[in-house]
UniProtKB/Swiss-Prot annotation:
PANTHER family: NICKEL-RESPONSIVE REGULATOR (PTHR34719:SF2). Disulfide bonds: none annotated. Pfam families: NikR_C, RHH_1. Ni(2+) binds at residues 83, 94, 96, 102. Belongs to the transcriptional regulatory CopG/NikR family. The keyword Protease does not apply. Keywords: DNA-binding, Metal-binding, Nickel, Transcription, Transcription regulation. This is Putative nickel-responsive regulator.
């Protein structure tokens, strides 16, 4: 158990049945001891990524923002957001996953604060189902 987690609080969450089935399979395979542990770890990792976006400064980073979205619902707003961030978007790759869904990968370079702002805006677009930002420092740290 991590420091600060000695006072656990019981809560409940609602998840799609297929997601819970995958969680149960991971537990059965021995990757995690329990549902609680897998959800705690997932929350920790997600919160660490979000906290980075809140504290990052003007240091230069390289990165990739990958996201899946519902084409008809999200595309107009995504194009608008991308045009507001041409200063950090180096390249865009667009893939048609199905008739309804697309995947895009944005290659990024620029101030971390600006990259974080772009990721936040993309995640906030209705119809974006998943988004993941991966960054590396231009200093190699």
């Amino acid at each position: 158990m991590n420091k600060g987690e000695d006072n656990l609080v019981r809560t409940s969450i609602t998840v799609p049945e297929q997601l819970l089935q995958k969680v149960n399979e991971l537990i059965a395979s021995g990757y995690f001891a329990s549902r609680s542990e897998i959800f705690r770890q997932a929350l920790r990792e997600y919160l660490q990524r979000i906290e980075w976006t809140e504290r990052v400064g003007d240091e230069e980073y390289f990165g990739a923002l990958t996201y899946v979205f519902q084409h008809e619902r999200a595309e107009p707003e995504l194009v608008k957001v991308q045009h507001e961030f041409t200063d950090v978007i180096i390249s865009t790759t667009h893939i048609h996953v199905s008739p309804e869904k697309c995947l895009e990968v944005l290659l990024l370079q620029g101030p971390g604060k600006r990259i974080a702002e772009l990721a936040k805006r993309i995640r906030g677009v209705r119809g974006v189902e998943q988004a993941k930002l991966t960054v590396v420092s231009s200093e190699g740290e």
